[in-house]
Amino acid sequence: MSQNLKFETLCLHAGQEPDPKTLSRAVPIYRTSSYVFKSSKHAADLFSLKELGNIYTRLMNPTQAVLEDRIAALEGGAAALALASGTSAIYYAIINICAAGDEIVSANNLYGGTYTMFNSILPQFGIRVKFVDPREPENFAKAINEKTKAVFIETIGNPGLEFTDIAAVADIAHQHHLPVIVDATFTTPYLIRAIDHGADIVVNSMTKWIGGHGTGIGGVVIDSGKFDWKNPKFRLFNEPDGSYFGIRFAHDLGDLNPIAFILRMRLVPLRNLGACISPDNAWMFLQGLETLHLRMERLCHNAKQTARFLKNHPKVTWVRYPGLEDDPSFPMANRYLKNGFGAMVVFGISGGRNAGEKFIDNLALFSHLANVGDAKSLALH
């Protein structure tokens, strides 16, 4: 689809043409586990990647394909892969590059679930994560060594709301021929396309603002198509892959080489571990995308107004919101974000833990739950 189309048009149209059989304008939900092969040769061509098409819904599904193409267009990427959750998206992005003995360098201001995965789970598989303070990009350079295979950051840190200098971190990573993986959940492509600033891989928990209504769980990985995986340090891409017919993903894909990362993720981690998204959840996230631009604009406005209100409240001791001009993240966020500063506000109240619990327990309109990105306001402590 034309790259000249506006963001809101891509939200509605990217990745889809009316169904050729039924002429349905809306995206159908394809509830099927598998697909009929036209012939033995057709099946062989699909498995050998001579032809791309549907084999089994653990690998791909037509509803899922529209979602992937639409998000890839919104992020400015070459291809995308939708998965069962944001957590599985991050995990697959890492194990698609790293094996036992490898390392990644990560910002330390991460969502708690990601931090636990990096600090406790990945080491069990022999993958070491070095955590650094992302406020000084040179910290990444100091932590990189010959075992490093990737650099990981979040656009806006969860929950501290610090904004990372994406381009500076990307420059350092690329000097060492390393890919940058950016979790853009808190910004979505409406606020920033991280690929435009040097990200090689973008991950997003669609459960949050992309879905926008708290009705489904899903994640997505977007491949910029710009990173060269032929460097021998990326042995998973350069050595014959025993789990998929001995293919060398950095060398044997022909015209598909630019999307080697996503193809390998689909054919190795997803095919063999199975964290696939359901067609119904894919369809729900497509509904969310249709209003993403409208919701994010209003959510950012409401968050800024809330932050200003809290800033002047006598019982509030501090407020973090990247859109406040005196916030430590404002100078950096203002450089990158042109459509708003996000939909989250973090603050502290006087009186310590007891006061915090009393505040949470007396909420009326706001819901107390473990999620973010819902259309309905929520609070979490």
Residue positions per predicted region:
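Conserved PLP-enzyme active-site core in the AAT-like
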Residues: S2, C11-H13, E17, A79-H313
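Conserved N-terminal alpha-helix of the aminotransferase class I/II PLP-enzyme fold
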Residues: S34, S39-Y91, G113-I121
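Conserved C-terminal alpha-helix-loop-beta "cap" of PLP-dependent enzymes
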Residues: M296, K304, K311, K315-H381
